[in-house]
Structure formats: C-alpha cells, structure tokens
Design a protein with these regions (language model features):
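Substrate-binding/gating loop at the entrance of the active-site cleft, primarily
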Residues: 1-10
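Active-site region of PLP-dependent enzymes
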Residues: 36-147
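Conserved PLP phosphate-binding loop immediately N-terminal to the Schiff-base lysine helix
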Residues: 10-52
Length: 147
C-alpha cells in the first residue's frame, strides 16, 4: 500500500505505535494492509482491510485481492470504483449521467471459482508461512525512475 500511495502522490504516515505482524495500519487511518492475514474473526469493525490473493499470500489465486469493510457507504463507493465508476442500479449504463472515478478492478469468474474452491477445501497457506519481519519503511527511498 505505501508504494501505491507513493505512485499516486498521496502523503502517508506509517503507524509506528504497533508492531507489524501479518498486517499493519496506514498511519492513524482506518486502513489496514492485511495482505498476509486471512483467518476467521480477522475483520475489524469500522476499518478497511486490504487483502491480497497474489503469489505467496494465504489465498494464493495468483493475483487480485479484496477490501473488507463493515461500512455500507464505503462498500457502495468501492463497488462503483470496481465497475468503472458505474452505478449498477442504472441500466443501461449509458443512462447514467454522473460517474465517479473507476478502475475496472474486479476478479474474473474463473478466479472467483478458484478462490471459493480453495476456501471450501481449506487449501490455504498456514498462518506461520505469512509471518514477515517488515523493515522500517520510513528510511527507505523510493526511486521513481525519473532522470
């Protein structure tokens, strides 16, 4: 998540108050990078948790992810973003007069099936394999490739 913030030019601060293990909070926000945590009871009410289904992650579909939230308004905004800013209650979409920013981020049907099958069969990486010692990112310089 810090790399995405950097790419988008969003100022961010890392939460140095808690030890990072499996997940970490972005500054003093309600956003968590939970890419390495997927287990029953992990959801945090009133927070947003970003999951990853990439290589080496607990649910290793190979790419993609999800965002957990208990806030319906946030879920509605995120859903619109996933569908090119479209409001799925308006059909045909050409009748929609106002769009929000959208990204066309949604999993394929095949990836959904694969993920559901993996969850049902328990084909998940064990929690210990997800333990990572995060470096102190406050001292890492990100080179943006500009010369």
């Amino acid at each position: 998540i810090p790399m995405t913030f950097h790419k988008l030019g969003i100022e961010y601060h890392l939460d140095t108050e808690v030890e990072w293990e499996y997940e970490y909070r972005i500054g003093l926000t309600t956003i968590w990078d939970s890419a390495r945590l997927l287990q029953p009871g992990m959801a945090r009410a009133g927070q947003m948790q970003c999951l990853s289904f990439g290589h080496t992650k607990t649910l290793e579909i190979g790419h993609g992810g999800a965002i957990l939230t208990s806030n319906k308004a946030d879920a509605d905004k995120l859903r619109r973003m996933a569908y090119d800013g479209r409001d799925l209650s308006i059909s045909p979409w050409q009748d929609q007069k106002e769009f929000s920013v959208g990204y066309h981020y949604k999993p394929s049907i095949e990836d959904c099936i694969k993920g559901l099958e993996m969850l049902a069969s328990g084909e998940l990486k064990d929690k210990e394999s997800q333990r990572v010692t995060y470096p102190d990112l406050t001292g890492i310089k990100i080179w943006d490739g500009r010369v």
